[in-house]
């Protein structure tokens, strides 16, 4: 048998850090990159006698996320203790939601909305701390301990690493649009565990799955799933059996490695958290949060196509990232969507890609580009000169108005002035005039070029064409 004879089955458990200034059960801050152990309260350190106090903002963000994926909101959920020992888990247990999660039965669409990936549940839980290993010592940083996570659990509906990657991108897009998670995988605020198994094509039974922990980039998700699927296929084709293990992905070697044998839920001895009351959510609260949801990416894309006449490809590019969509929205407040799309996707994206920076870090903000488009639309400068101004704006950060003034780039629209220039060019090139009149109409471009050369590109193309047509007959 070959790889083509096997089907890969994948389910993802995505850990999304809630965009909250404080932790799930304490008032400690959640800023990234601070000094070790500087954002730790007595609750986070599990000092005796301390009690958790629920951060209700995190509840609202979980509800918001559930509504964004058309899920059911559990009107009465509660927290449980997941018991296990690890050096960076001060309590000796994690507060999570095992029996009654806050969100159930959602869906995310991939493959151009043609395939539905079911979401089994979203529950809130605490993050653990971080172990920092040196040669002979291990240090523990509790800054991350107690940070609120949403664990978003998909059903095993994914069938390839490419689908898993697209699912992660789509989920991250939704989270960023609603603002419940910043989706920054480099900072660890979005990561996932991948449950991978294989089965013969046509089989409905699931194979033995292995869980690959803590994948923190789309590229690693793809590499880890591809390697693990191939590893399992080789074992099965050689007559072996798959052991249900928890794995780590070695990014240097590009291989999965056994971390430990996979535990069952009974190993964690779950029981209800005695220090927290059940979380009761009214329908009025759910309706209020639903009414405050922003326009989601799929809705925005359809609006751009149906109402603004943008083609599907450009609409997809613009809505793929919330910051890009916000930038575009600022442009179309004053300008036609066609000119806005061109300057955003061609001019700005071209320079951003070349400079290897994202739109958030762009030296040209939306209001600055909008001002430049004002000058092009009202004829102050030509589109060609607009690109020169744009380049200077990108390099210096100066506004278009200042550059136009400093460079003396205002378009010449005075008919008499342009007529005088054209008369001089026509008189100096009578041979070309005769050739043009005898049928060599391509010479028209020569005369336009001479006018632009004489005016350093500042002559209004419309006025030039009008006067030149009269002169050449």
UniProtKB/Swiss-Prot annotation:
- Reactions that this protein is recorded to catalyse: L-glutamyl-tRNA(Gln) + L-glutamine + ATP + H2O = L-glutaminyl-tRNA(Gln) + L-glutamate + ADP + phosphate + H(+); L-aspartyl-tRNA(Asn) + L-glutamine + ATP + H2O = L-asparaginyl-tRNA(Asn) + L-glutamate + ADP + phosphate + 2 H(+)
> What InterPro entries has UniProt attached to this entry?
Asn/Gln-tRNA_amidoTrfase_suB/E, Asn/Gln-tRNA_Trfase_suB/E_cat, Asn/Gln_amidotransferase, Asn/Gln_tRNA_amidoTrase-B-like, GatB, GatB_C_1, GatB_Yqey_C_2, Gln-tRNA_amidoTrfase_suB_CS
Is S-adenosyl-L-methionine found in the keyword set?
Answer: no
Keyword terms, alphabetized: ATP-binding, Ligase, Nucleotide-binding, Protein biosynthesis
Does the entry annotate any disulfide bonds, and if so which pairs? none
GO terms classed as biological process: glutaminyl-tRNAGln biosynthesis via transamidation; translation
A GO MF label: ATP binding
PROSITE patterns cross-referenced by the UniProt entry: GATB (PS01234)
Recorded E.C. number(s)?
Answer: 6.3.5.-
Q: What is this protein called?
A: Aspartyl/glutamyl-tRNA(Asn/Gln) amidotransferase subunit B
């Amino acid at each position: 048998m070959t790889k083509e004879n096997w089907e890969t089955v994948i389910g993802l458990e995505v850990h999304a850090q809630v965009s909250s200034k404080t932790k799930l059960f304490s008032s400690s801050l959640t800023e990234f990159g601070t000094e070790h152990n500087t954002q730790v309260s007595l609750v986070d350190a599990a000092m005796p006698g301390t009690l958790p106090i629920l951060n209700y903002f995190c509840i609202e963000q979980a509800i918001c996320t559930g509504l964004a994926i058309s899920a059911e909101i559990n009107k009465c959920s509660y927290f449980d203790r997941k018991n296990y020992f690890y050096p960076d888990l001060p309590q000796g247990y994690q507060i999570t939601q095992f029996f009654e999660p806050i969100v159930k039965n959602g869906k995310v669409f991939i493959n151009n909305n043609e395939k539905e990936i079911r979401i089994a549940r979203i529950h809130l839980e605490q993050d653990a701390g971080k172990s920092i290993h040196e040669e002979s010592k291990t240090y523990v940083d509790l800054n991350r301990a107690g940070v609120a996570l949403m664990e978003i659990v998909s059903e095993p509906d994914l069938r390839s690493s490419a689908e898993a990657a697209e699912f992660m991108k789509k989920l991250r897009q939704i989270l960023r649009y609603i603002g419940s998670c910043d989706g920054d995988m480099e900072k660890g605020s979005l990561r996932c565990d991948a449950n991978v198994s294989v089965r013969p094509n046509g089989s409905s039974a699931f194979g033995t799955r292995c869980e690959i922990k803590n994948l923190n980039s789309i590229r690693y998700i793809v590499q880890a799933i591809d390697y693990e699927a191939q590893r399992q296929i080789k074992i099965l084709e050689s007559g072996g059996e798959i052991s249900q293990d928890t794995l780590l992905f070695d990014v240097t070697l590009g291989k999965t490695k056994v971390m430990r044998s996979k535990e069952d839920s009974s190993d964690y001895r779950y029981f209800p958290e005695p220090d927290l009351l059940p979380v009761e959510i009214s329908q009025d609260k759910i309706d209020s949060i639903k009414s405050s949801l922003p326009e989601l990416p799929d809705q925005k894309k359809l609006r751009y196509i149906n109402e603004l006449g943008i083609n599907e490809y450009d609409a997809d590019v613009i809505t793929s990232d919330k910051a890009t969509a916000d930038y575009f929205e600022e442009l179309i407040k004053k300008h036609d969507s066609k000119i806005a799309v061109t300057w955003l996707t061609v001019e700005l994206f071209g320079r951003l890609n070349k400079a290897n920076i994202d739109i958030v870090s762009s030296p040209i903000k939306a209001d600055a580009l909008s001002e430049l488009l004002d000058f092009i639309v009202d004829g102050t400068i030509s589109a060609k000169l607009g690109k020169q101004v744009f380049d200077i704006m990108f390099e210096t950060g100066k506004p278009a108005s200042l550059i136009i003034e400093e460079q003396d780039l205002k378009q010449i629209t005075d008919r008499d002035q342009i007529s005088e220039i054209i008369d001089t060019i026509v008189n100096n090139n009578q041979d070309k005039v005769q050739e043009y009149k005898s049928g060599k109409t391509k010479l028209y471009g020569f005369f336009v070029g001479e006018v632009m050369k004489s005016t350093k590109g500042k002559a209004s193309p419309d006025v030039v064409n009008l006067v030149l047509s009269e002169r050449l007959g």
